[in-house]
């Protein structure tokens, strides 16, 4: 269904209304039928409100099929239509506190509640408050306690029969609990997918090389509307009941909160995040309380729902057009919005990670004006096919960094430009590289790069590195921001007068830091290597490097093959070490530390090579708990026989020795077809009798 023609101005109400109807119907089709929404909720709401206003001002422009006259959507051709016994209507929306106050006043007026001389309601209305789930509305039909049919909302009057798919959702009971069950019960509720289940589903999709879902709502809708119910059964769907259609053969509870309590006794899942409150103040208190906890909830919501609690008062208020007068959906500020992508820059993180950042035309989303949004990495830009000049959907949820969700492809201009990852760091000019099997590109500037400076200095001073006591993050911030320190070597040039001039840095603190810097000049080779902050090189690897080579220069000049001979150094770590020392900036800083800083450590000859044994040239991995040997004892025995004991399984692994509770290493070995031995098999191997 193609996007509507050129947008007419507001000065032409007839054409504008026709365009709005066409645009909303197109969005409805994409949302309900194709399950491929391309218009953010906030944009849809804005267009809908505008159409309502035009039709209110020009009643002659109202058409029977206008989106304002119905709920929206139509049955897909692959499902049998189901006419609802009672329409599944949508709710009127509120976006601001004032909308809620006005709703409460309308309800109070409609119920003839008492007011004082100032017009303030003195007899507050009682409301039931619930969450507004971001899923798919469903009607469940039970006859004499047995589940017989399920249907989607559709256009509110006619939906789609999804009975077989709904049967696969374990949260939905096929038989209700209790003895006096109604002859017929029409339960209204929402099918949704929890955040954790959504993440796992997308992991499975990626592993299978299949398309990932954009969000939990799309995943739930796409899963429910499968023609093959086996596919639905494989999807982690959930359900919450929140309303009622038709009830026959039982008394209707007097209140909405009572209805939900009754549902729980029947075994239907009902969300516990609900409350009964009085008046507008109670409604707003519930809204703001939920808003504060929204991001920590295990599922997506886009607002809360208020309903007059008493059933008799609901009946008195009745319905207007497409929605009940007794209810309101109070929506949170839009988390998604449309805007234009002006440019794509790259940002250098504190660890050298290169992140593409979208520069946007300002847009208000998630309660704030957004001008920049993350694009995560180069692969994400390619996967989403995002280009400079595109109209894009931007998402901002709570304190989460804004991100570009997708491009609106049918709005793409002819001159849209693809993103090209730069080859040099914009901060220091060093080479940008991306290691195999990694999604993140990184600056190789290391100790020299300004963007990485604070993190490099903080790591350099850590207790397990050079142990510079008194050099905390706040002091580092001042030193860098005042351009007093550019590299770790500059730390050893700091004088007393420079330090006491820093904010909140007393004379005693300055003397202590100078003493600490003096002590740090005398360290060990392993600590110095660790202090350099080489990616993938932790304390253990630093010790192995120092032990294997004995001094720093051979490490700096070692080819990758020589690095691979070091215990527990695999291809990725070896490549990282090699690239670090290949960068001239890093070598310069190291020379400054040795010369200007006078940082020293004992050096010696390389460690003697292990004697040639029955396992010379073999790589062995230990995993799990062995019956009689500790991990360290087994390692010593294997190394004494000439084996290299590695920490991870790869194609270069010759044997895996597995004990109890072996985990992913064992699975990886079986996947690669690597021989797996138990402790007895290891002893046989060491005796030279292995095959």
Curated annotation (Swiss-Prot):
The active site is at 132 (n6-amp-lysine intermediate). GO terms for biological process: DNA repair; DNA replication. Its EC number is 6.5.1.2. Gene3D superfamilies: 5' to 3' exonuclease, C-terminal subdomain (1.10.150.20), 6.20.10.30, BRCT domain (3.40.50.10190), DNA ligase/mRNA capping enzyme (3.30.470.30), Helix hairpin bin (1.10.287.610), Nucleic acid-binding proteins (2.40.50.140). It catalyses: NAD(+) + (deoxyribonucleotide)n-3'-hydroxyl + 5'-phospho-(deoxyribonucleotide)m = (deoxyribonucleotide)n+m + AMP + beta-nicotinamide D-nucleotide. InterPro entries: BRCT_dom (IPR001357), BRCT_dom_sf (IPR036420), DisA/LigA_HHH (IPR041663), DNA_ligase (IPR001679), DNA_ligase_AS (IPR018239), DNA_ligase_CS (IPR033136), DNAligase_adenylation (IPR013839), DNAligase_N (IPR013840). DNA ligase that catalyzes the formation of phosphodiester linkages between 5'-phosphoryl and 3'-hydroxyl groups in double-stranded DNA using NAD as a coenzyme and as the energy source for the reaction. It is essential for DNA replication and repair of damaged DNA. HAMAP family: DNA_ligase_A. This is DNA ligase. It comes from Burkholderia pseudomallei (strain 668). The gene is ligA.
